[in-house]
Amino acid sequence: MSEAGKKQTEGETTISENRALSGVPVMEREVTALLEEISSCPETAAVAVGGSRATGKADKKSDYDIYVYVEMEIAKERRKSILEKYCGVMEIGNHYWESEDNCTLNNGVDIDIIYRKLQDFEGDVAAVVEQYRASNGYTTCMWHNLVTCRILYDRDGALEAMKKRFDVPYPEVLRAEIIRKNRALLSGVLPSYDAQIRKAASRRDLVSINHRTTEFLASYFDILFAMNRQTHPGEKRLVSLC
């Protein structure tokens, strides 16, 4: 066990112990050690693994999607001091989508560590599941991410409580809102994607055609998952999953 793991308070379950209990496929030893160090930071409330590593669909090219739920930000210097022990390539503090450290482990496997404020994330999921807020595509992705993640560390049980809160049947009002909003974007109103695609095609604007077609498909799959009362898994393997 790493030194960080030894610092766990008495009676507290470590990452290496908890991963077997939670059903997570066996992780590389260095990943386990890395996550034990992150979980030892006082700012860390919970750690979970998501994506194909959590659902059992990982292949040789699959990276690690790690979600660190914090009460306040862990200092970049502290994160770097942990990650440099296990990663040959590090990009600390990327903010292209969420707050992330994007790295490559010493064994060549990529690992994305996403940091989320626990309360903010819970509010975002509640806005969809309980307040029925539909988006232009990908509406239920965060909900899906929560209910399918595997918890590795949960200091006060807050993440498990959140999973239980949102482990509910697909709300019919939300389903209707997703279909209504995204169906209009496919066709039938002035800004609909089909009209924009035709206009771009008439101009032979290949970049615009590609962009509008991508948005069309985002709304199209959002409708399909809603119709089937399935949470949206993201942008990968959509044809086989819907």
What are these regions (language model features)?
Residues 2-48:
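Helical scaffold of the NTase/Pol beta-like nucleotidyltransferase catalytic core
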Residues 189-193, 197, 209, 216, ...:
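Amphipathic alpha-helices that form helix-helix packing interfaces
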Residues 229-242:
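Short, charged amphipathic alpha-helical segments flanked by flexible coils
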